[in-house]
Amino acid sequence: MGNDKQDLLKISKELVSIAASKATVNVPGVNQEKGVKITHGKEGFIIDVYVIADFGVKIPQLAWDIQNSVKEAVTAAANVAVMTVNIHVQGVMMPREGSI
């Protein structure tokens, strides 16, 4: 019985990861999604999202938009509680020369 619970948690983590990744790349201003880390806490999932932002984007607004998008997508796809969505902006993609 304990193994079934672990298998279910593994499936849930995979589903949460996929939903979070898809939600992240659909947010305007995200140049690249670098990864998602899922941790299961006592009251729900803790999701860490790593991104590269587009040049000129307001980082606080981008983080807010990603958080909302991820929470909505994960809740809809997996019907699980999301405790926290942490956004880690790992860089900014500069525009190509001549494209400004």
Task: Locate predicted features.
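N-terminal first-folded block
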Residues: 11-31
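Extended, well-folded interaction surfaces typified by the phenylalanyl-tRNA synthetase beta subunit core
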Residues: 2-4, 39
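Short, non-transmembrane amphipathic alpha-helical segments
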Residues: 20, 59-80
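Short edge beta-strands and adjacent turn/loop segments
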Residues: 27-52, 90-91
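Polar/charged, Gly/Pro-rich intrinsically disordered segments
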Residues: 2, 17, 21, 88-100
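C-terminal structural segments of small proteins and small subunits
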Residues: 72-95
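Short secondary-structure junctions
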Residues: 25-33, 76-81
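Residue-level signature of catalytic and energy-coupling elements of molecular machines
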Residues: 8, 24, 70
